A protein has these predicted regions:
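N-terminal secretory-pathway/extracellular module detecting exported/lumenal segments
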Residues: 1-151
């Protein structure tokens, strides 16, 4: 993991903050996110779950809905500085969370299929590829009004 520089320019090791899943998303609060015409799935972010940690990680709940109505719910993080994504927990039908088995960070690819993380990283959360675009209200506004952060 890359080290960070403090205000004096000294290197310090990056430390990930603990991430606890938020309240389960309410269907009426979800913000649709346009990911790709190549996918028949629909993607949503729960605005109440968005946080920007002191560790530079944007955490959020992603809901993926298939055309048949099946849903996958996951609590995730994107680390802007390293272009990585991580799963913290997965939603259950009863509204509870199950911790992810692997706590590994994964490189975010921007490809035609399964590109939701690439879209969130480049268009909404980390346009400069170094740090989050702003606090949760800025991210929420951009998601709601379809304004990518690259404008």
């Amino acid at each position: 993991r890359p080290d960070l520089e403090d205000e004096e320019g000294d290197k310090k090791e990056w430390v990930e903050l603990e991430a606890k899943p938020p309240s389960y998303p309410k269907p009426g609060n979800l913000i649709p996110v346009d990911v790709s015409a190549a996918s028949s799935n629909r993607f949503f972010i729960d605005p109440d779950s968005i946080s920007v940690g002191g560790d530079g990680v944007v955490r959020y709940t992603l809901v993926i809905r298939s055309p048949a109505g099946a849903e996958n719910v996951s609590y995730e993080g994107i680390r802007c500085e390293t272009r990585e994504q991580k799963y913290y927990a997965f939603g259950r039908r009863d509204g509870s969370w199950s911790s992810a088995r692997s706590g590994a960070w994964r490189w975010i690819e921007y490809k035609e299929i399964n590109r939701q993380h690439g879209v969130l990283y480049l268009d909404y959360f980390c346009p400069d590829k170094k740090r989050p675009v702003g606090p949760p209200p800025v991210i929420i506004r951009r998601l709601k009004y379809g304004v990518p952060a690259r404008d």
